[in-house]
Curated annotation (Swiss-Prot):
GO BP term, example: rRNA base methylation
Record-linked InterPro entries: Aldolase_TIM (IPR013785), Methyltransferase_A (IPR040072), RlmN_N (IPR048641), RNA_MTrfase_RlmN (IPR027492), rRNA_lsu_MTrfase_RlmN/Cfr (IPR004383), rSAM (IPR007197)
Remaining remarks: Reaction proceeds by a ping-pong mechanism involving intermediate methylation of a conserved cysteine residue.
Subcellular compartments: Cytoplasm
Catalytic reactions of this protein: adenosine(2503) in 23S rRNA + 2 reduced [2Fe-2S]-[ferredoxin] + 2 S-adenosyl-L-methionine = 2-methyladenosine(2503) in 23S rRNA + 5'-deoxyadenosine + L-methionine + 2 oxidized [2Fe-2S]-[ferredoxin] + S-adenosyl-L-homocysteine; adenosine(37) in tRNA + 2 reduced [2Fe-2S]-[ferredoxin] + 2 S-adenosyl-L-methionine = 2-methyladenosine(37) in tRNA + 5'-deoxyadenosine + L-methionine + 2 oxidized [2Fe-2S]-[ferredoxin] + S-adenosyl-L-homocysteine
Biological source species: Klebsiella pneumoniae subsp. pneumoniae (strain ATCC 700721 / MGH 78578)
Cofactor(s) it depends on: [4Fe-4S] cluster
Lineage: Bacteria, Pseudomonadati, Pseudomonadota, Gammaproteobacteria, Enterobacterales
Gene: rlmN
Name of the molecule in the record: Dual-specificity RNA methyltransferase RlmN
NCBIfam families, A to Z: PRK11194.1, rRNA_mod_RlmN
Chain sites annotated for binding S-adenosyl-L-methionine: 183-184, 215, 237-239, 316
EC number: 2.1.1.192
Annotated residues for binding of [4Fe-4S] cluster: 129, 133, 136
Highest taxon of source: Bacteria
Length: 388
């Protein structure tokens, strides 16, 4: 496995062929202003169009009534606002909504999670995932490609448009975005960072940097670069108290071990305002794998120099997985040990598991360029992952 780190530039201003239109959802504000400058227009026109796009979820230039007709006609000739379409929707009894979203000839999944005081959108960054974490349904699908900026921010745009159109009492607007869907965000920096910039931009979705969270399994070179690119909340998929266990369940650990990963994490939060001096640790609870009290003591020792809060995540099963969910009693004992050490510890409430929308269950529909499924079959290992 190798990773390519690409920083945002003006590549989004290019189109596949001379007849194609530029999708304005691919452009952050800096790129949008450059686009309008190249059209001979003033930069403020970019701000006007972005406001229509993101504040009102408008994808029709003719509806942008504070823009003159001549410019609207020019825009229709060279540009478009095209978000990926929802092809299937599932609603959980707890209010969670999972959308299967078409990206080309494949699907990714986006999840809307309403709570009493907020509504969180879980967004995908890749079609599939190359990291092969053993407990994650997405990883069993293999990897196909990175999502474009328009396909990432388009998930937020599409969800905001749907939620905004629902007048039912209790449907909350999106207040938080977590990059915790399909894929490893740090292996797609050149698209993830501009998409998050749009989430934060006042002319975009205008979210607070503390309400946009990037979750990573530990692509250290990219994490080292991230702090110079954008400031958002950070969550790390740790899931183990030592390298022996993590090597097995999170294979990227063999390349960047826990010590290297945590050093990079501390470097990021030291210069981040969004994290307020601490990081969120994600720890999936696997029955008799990483959930013993001895593991809790080991985790506490490991994290003693890393300011953090710890989210314990009851594992969500999927067909063919080799693990079991930790019992409530084992999770409770684990949590109590951590709290005795003074760690803020939260047991995450499982949401959307009746529609396979819970953490680790997102599968989508992936044409596997890594041939992972074929390799597994040749090795005699059963694969039975549900696609939406």
């Amino acid at each position: 496995m190798s990773e390519q780190i690409v920083t945002p530039d003006t590549a989004a201003l290019t189109v596949p062929n001379k007849d194609a239109k530029i999708n304005l959802l691919d452009l952050n504000r800096q790129q949008m202003r450059e686009f309008f400058k190249n059209m001979g227009e003033k930069p403020f026109r970019a701000d006007q169009v972005m406001k229509w796009m993101y504040h009102y979820c408008c994808d029709d230039f003719d509806e942008m009534t504070d823009i003159n007709k001549v410019l609207r006609s020019k825009l229709k000739e060279v540009a478009e606002i095209r978000a990926p379409e929802v092809v299937e929707e599932q609603r959980s009894t707890d209010g969670t909504i999972k959308w299967a979203i078409a990206v080309g000839d494949q699907r990714v999944e986006t999840v809307y999670i309403p709570e009493e005081d907020r509504a969180t959108l879980c967004v995908s960054s890749q079609v599939g995932c190359a990291l092969e974490c053993k407990f994650c349904s997405t990883a069993q699908q293999g990897f196909n490609r990175n999502l474009r900026v328009s396909e990432i921010i388009g998930q937020v745009w599409r969800a905001a448009k749907i939620v905004g159109a629902v007048k039912t009492t209790g449907v909350r607007p999106i207040t938080n975005v977590v990059m915790m869907g399909m894929g490893e965000p740090l292996l797609n920096l050149n698209n993830v960072v501009p998409a998050m910039e749009i989430m934060l931009d006042d002319f975009g979705f205008g979210l607070s940097k503390r309400r946009v969270t990037l979750s990573t399994s530990g692509v250290v070179p990219a994490l080292d670069k991230l702090g110079d690119m954008i400031d958002v909340a950070l969550a790390i998929s740790l899931h183990a108290p030592n390298d022996t266990i993590r090597d097995e369940i999170v294979p990227i650990n063999k390349k960047y071990n826990i010590e290297t990963f945590l050093n990079s994490v501390r470097g990021y939060i030291s210069k981040s305002n969004a994290n307020q001096g601490r990081v969120t640790i994600e720890y999936v609870m696997l029955d008799h794998v990483n959930d013993g009290t001895e593991h809790a003591h080991e985790l506490a020792a490991l994290l003693k120099d890393t300011p953090c809060k710890i989210n314990l995540i009851p594992w969500n099963p999927f067909p063919g997985a080799p693990y079991g969910r930790s019992s409530n009693s084992r999770i409770d004992r684990f949590s109590k040990v951590l709290m005795e050490y003074g760690f803020t510890t939260i047991v995450r409430k499982t949401r959307g598991d009746d529609i396979d929308a819970a953490c680790g269950q997102l599968a989508g529909d992936v044409i596997d360029r890594t041939k992972r499924t074929l390799r597994k079959r040749m090795q005699g290992e059963a694969i039975d992952v549900k696609a939406v």
